Amino acid sequence: SFDHNTEPSSRKVDYLEIVTPDFIHVPATEKDAEAVAWMTAHVNSTLAELGFTVSTGRVVDFRFREMLHNDYFDGAVPMVNASHLRGGIVRHPIGTKKPEWFHSDPESMVKFVVPGGSYVLIKRFSAKEEKRRIVSAVWCSEGSVAFDNKLNYIHKDGHGLDPEIAAGLAVFLNSTRVDEYFRVFSGHTQVNATDLRMMRFPRLEQLRALAKHVVAEQQDIDSVVEQVLASEEACE
């Protein structure tokens, strides 16, 4: 807000910086404009163009309490929720109060679980202590798994991704570049599947290059993303 004594400010922005084929950006500051410009220059594929799909986890905990269990037993599959994503890694089980296993009749199992494989998980709601809006990690398993409704997951036709591609996607999504870009066009803390469908992602060869440098520290993640996506070789 401004008082009557505040000098108003204005910015001239090129039309193409605001209106794109996918949505309208509002780069209110120079930092916003730079975030959009960088992403536009170095990233140009949608998930659909890469052959991938993003969906929301199928299990709504309060609706399926009878299918959720605190302890493992024969036939149960992992029930993965947002609390299992920590530091770019999915840790399961971790001994939380929330049920960590899912089991039901065969018909429901087919409906609510996904086959084993590598999936990129993204929290739909970021926690207060998390600095980034988008928090991502890779889940990898041989057996089936159930994902909580508070998670989005990237897959290929309902099955897992190439593990290398999944790792590259997680590195990209956890970068500061993506966080700054996401904040330009999304004013809320929720990350919807629709938002992810509209975003731009690196090409497959770039994702494989990112996967060779899987790191945990934010500074290292950002350095790798800059190195791979902004390099002349990656942009050829």
Task: Name what the model sees in each region.
Residues 1-45:
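Signature of N6-adenine DNA methyltransferases within the class I
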Residues 3, 235-236:
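A short, terminal or domain-edge coil/loop segment
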Residues 31-234:
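Polybasic, glycine- and aromatic-enriched phosphate-binding surface used to engage nucleic acids
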